[in-house]
């Protein structure tokens, strides 16, 4: 458990390097990330490398026992490369090459880009392989499943399709290309998605996103092999995010040592209740990718803003609180972006720890306090794990398929997952967010929102889970299509209808209209966006619609199947219904939860060989009182706390539990 910073010595005069490193040491910074955007300084002329300045920086930090993560600088190739090898630049959906001088516009499949990627990564790793201060490598920066439409990508996509389908006849059949006379008769007719039209075949678009993700993964592995060969004792990761075309995270990190994530909680006022815990959701998802703790490689440090209007300045407590939020979700190292506000370039208003004035301000002193507290806690909890018995299933394929053909205004795949996650946080229940194809053996409750695409292996595991006594929650838009994004000719939820004990006889995409349902006790709840009109076969109806032509029709059901239960939610709710339903399910499964946890509080239970630790984070701008279940000793203040205590806005407490 440690705190670090992202540092850009190439932006600053040398006299600042020593001062910055010394100040970092004094306040307890343990690690810095360097060089991920510095290609033009490392190779100013093709084939001529200059590592002297980086050697000096590493030495400055090394003598102060601050460890180094080096980034491969391939996100920002130098202009000489783009000028000489324009095929290295991405082509957009209009068939135009992107403008040079902007980051992230390299093509993963360009042979020129691969050639010079290999050269710079070989040179860096050979030089720093035996440098004890360098503990690891970050590959590139914030890669995504870029939809490049250049000739290289088109040719590679054809090869990808040949490997998957063998023949054009098979592609035509699986995609249904007969629609609008879209059948291929020659491989030359297969292109990247030029035009970017939503009228393009949805099966083709889903496959192109898979290809784009695979291209990104291949580029990661291309660099990983070089680094692993030259630096076998140093870790390898890459930093991902939740912007752009999201890749298959599980493929991306399969061969890397751990996940790294760039975490920028909003500093603006949150008016949507369901977005309050959005970044807790992201962190839980990151932990679930490799089922172990992860790093934050970029963490909020100040006012965000560059190519967009600036957001609000972080309120007192936010910098420390959001760092602890990530730690409580499994982030064993939190690296803050950035040490200094840039005074040059496009990111000069994406604020860091030290302002343009170079005067230590409120954010600096809060960051220093964070470093002290994390270093203290690390002495007590040097290694920890998070063990949960509730899981939410995530699939990048589902997410992208939903984006290709939006179902109704307001209904988004990730929001469906976040709604359940938000309710579980409100109940103080820890949740794993895992790949939808994972084994479910360790869980008692599994939530599988919007299984829009149907996979036979996933279906088999879900049946096995329920048959063994697990509780499964399904939602609307389940069992709509096969994995090629083609609609199934059977009643939803298709191959899950036996265990669900229900079929969808009709549906109504209501969008932003508000309807209501009534539960067994006669309590009324609002619903929105989508209404599946359900017809039970063996399931019990536990809520009915209260509006429209389907008044009194089934809205929510539960079915006893073998040793387990399957709930089917035909509509989308506000948090009150999810909280009510999940409370009943948690009672049934004898899982602990908090009935009256104040709004905004987030709980995490950390475990190691010394016992269990409860982290409580007040994710709100109000003082909150926590009513606990166990006595505990405060790790931060080294004193015994009772079961109850108050937290300042964005405040944090860590207790060693006395059970």
Swiss-Prot record:
Question: Temperature annotation for this entry?
Answer: Optimum temperature is 30-40 degrees Celsius for activities against both pNPAp and pNPGp when incubated 10 minutes at pH 6.0. Both activities completely lost after heating at 50 degrees Celsius for 20 minutes.
The stretch of residues making up the signal peptide is none
Q: How activity is regulated?
A: Inhibited by Cu(2+), Hg(2+) and Zn(2+). No effect with Ca(2+), Mg(2+), Mn(2+) or excess EDTA (10 mM).
Q: What is the enzyme's class at the highest EC level?
A: hydrolase
Activity's sensitivity to pH is recorded as:
Optimum pH is 6.0 for activities against both pNPAp and pNPGp. Stable in the range of pH 6.0-8.0.
EC number assigned by the record: 3.2.1.23
Span-the-membrane segments of this chain are none
Q: Report the InterPro entries cross-referenced here.
A: Beta_galactosidase_C (IPR013739), Beta_galactosidase_Trimer (IPR013738), Class_I_gatase-like (IPR029062), Glyco_hydro_42 (IPR003476), Glyco_hydro_42_N (IPR013529), Glycoside_hydrolase_SF (IPR017853)
Please list the residues that bind substrate.
103, 141, 307
Tell me the residue numbers annotated for binding Zn(2+): 107, 148, 150, 153
An example GO BP is: galactose metabolic process
Tell me, what does this protein do in biology? Involved in plant cell wall degradation in cooperation with cellulosome. Hydrolyzes both p-nitrophenyl-alpha-L-arabinopyranoside (pNPAp) and p-nitrophenyl-beta-D-galactopyranoside (pNPGp), with higher activity for pNPAp.
Task: Provide the family line.
Answer: Belongs to the glycosyl hydrolase 42 family.
The name under which this protein is listed is: Beta-galactosidase BgaA
Source species, please? Clostridium cellulovorans (strain ATCC 35296 / DSM 3052 / OCM 3 / 743B)
């Amino acid at each position: 458990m440690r705190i670090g910073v992202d540092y850009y010595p190439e932006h600053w005069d040398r006299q600042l390097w020593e001062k910055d490193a010394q100040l970092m040491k004094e306040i307890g910074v343990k690690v810095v990330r360097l060089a991920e955007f510095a290609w033009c300084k490392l190779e100013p002329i093709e084939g001529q490398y200059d590592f002297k300045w980086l050697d000096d920086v590493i030495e400055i930090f090394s003598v102060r026992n601050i460890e180094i993560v080096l980034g491969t600088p391939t996100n920002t190739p130098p202009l000489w490369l783009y000028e000489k090898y324009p095929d290295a630049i991405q082509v957009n959906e209009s068939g135009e090459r992107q403008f040079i001088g902007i980051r992230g516009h390299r093509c993963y499949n360009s042979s020129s880009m691969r050639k010079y990627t290999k050269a710079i990564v070989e040179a860096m790793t050979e030089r720093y392989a035996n440098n004890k201060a360098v503990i690891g490598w970050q590959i590139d920066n914030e890669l995504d499943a870029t939809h490049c439409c250049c000739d290289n990508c088109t040719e590679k996509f054809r090869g990808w399709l040949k490997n998957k389908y063998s023949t054009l006849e098979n592609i035509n059949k699986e995609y249904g290309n007969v629609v609008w006379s879209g059948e291929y008769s020659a491989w030359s007719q297969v292109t990247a998605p030029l035009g970017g039209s939503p009228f393009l075949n949805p099966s083709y678009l889903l496959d192109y996103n898979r290809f784009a993700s695979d291209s990104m993964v291949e580029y990661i592995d291309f660099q990983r092999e070089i680094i692993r060969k030259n630096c076998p004792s140093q870790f390898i990761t890459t930093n991902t995010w939740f912007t752009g075309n999201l890749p298959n995270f599980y493929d991306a990190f399969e061969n890397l040592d751990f996940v790294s994530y760039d975490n920028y909680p909003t500093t603006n006022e949150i008016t949507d209740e369901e977005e309050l815990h959005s970044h807790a959701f992201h962190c839980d998802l990151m932990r679930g990718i490799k089922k172990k703790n992860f790093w934050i490689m970029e963490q909020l440090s100040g006012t965000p803003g560059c190519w967009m209007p600036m957001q609000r300045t972080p309120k007192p407590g936010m910098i420390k609180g959001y760092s602890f939020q990530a730690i409580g979700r499994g982030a064993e190292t939190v690296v803050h972006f950035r040490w200094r506000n840039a005074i040059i370039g496009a990111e000069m208003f994406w604020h860091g720890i030290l302002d343009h004035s170079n005067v230590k301000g409120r954010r600096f002193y809060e960051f220093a306090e964070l470093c002290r507290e994390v270093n203290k806690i690390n002495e007590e909890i040097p290694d920890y794990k998070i063990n949960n018995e509730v899981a939410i299933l995530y699939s990048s394929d589902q997410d992208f398929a939903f984006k290709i053909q939006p179902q109704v205004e307001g209904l988004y795949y990730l929001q469906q997952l976040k709604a359940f996650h938000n309710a579980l946080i409100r109940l103080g229940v820890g949740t794993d967010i895992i790949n939808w194809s994972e084994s479910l053996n360790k869980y008692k409750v599994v939530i599988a929102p919007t299984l829009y695409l149907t996979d036979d292996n996933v279906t088999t595991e879900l049946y096995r889970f329920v048959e063994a006594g697990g509780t499964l929650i399904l939602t609307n838009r389940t069992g709509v299509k096969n994995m090629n994004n083609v609609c199934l000719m059977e009643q939803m939820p298709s191959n899950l209808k036996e265990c669900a004990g229900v079929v969808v006889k009709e549906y109504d995409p209501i969008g932003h209209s508000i309807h209501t349902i009534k539960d067994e006790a006669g309590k009324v709840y609002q619903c929105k966006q989508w209404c599946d009109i359900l017809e039970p076969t063996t399931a019990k109806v536990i809520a009915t619609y209260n509006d429209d032509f389907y008044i009194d029709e089934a809205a929510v059901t539960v079915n006893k199947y073998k040793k387990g239960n399957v709930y089917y939610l035909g509509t989308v709710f506000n948090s009150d219904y999810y909280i009510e339903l999940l409370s009943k399910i948690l009672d049934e499964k004898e899982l602990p939860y908090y009935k009256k946890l104040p709004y905004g509080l987030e709980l995490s239970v950390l475990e190691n060989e010394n016992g269990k630790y409860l982290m409580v984070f007040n994710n709100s701008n109000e003082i909150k009182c926590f009513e606990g279940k166990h006595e505990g000793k405060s790790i931060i203040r080294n004193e015994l706390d009772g079961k109850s205590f108050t937290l300042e806005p964005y405040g944090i407490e860590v207790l060693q539990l006395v059970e």
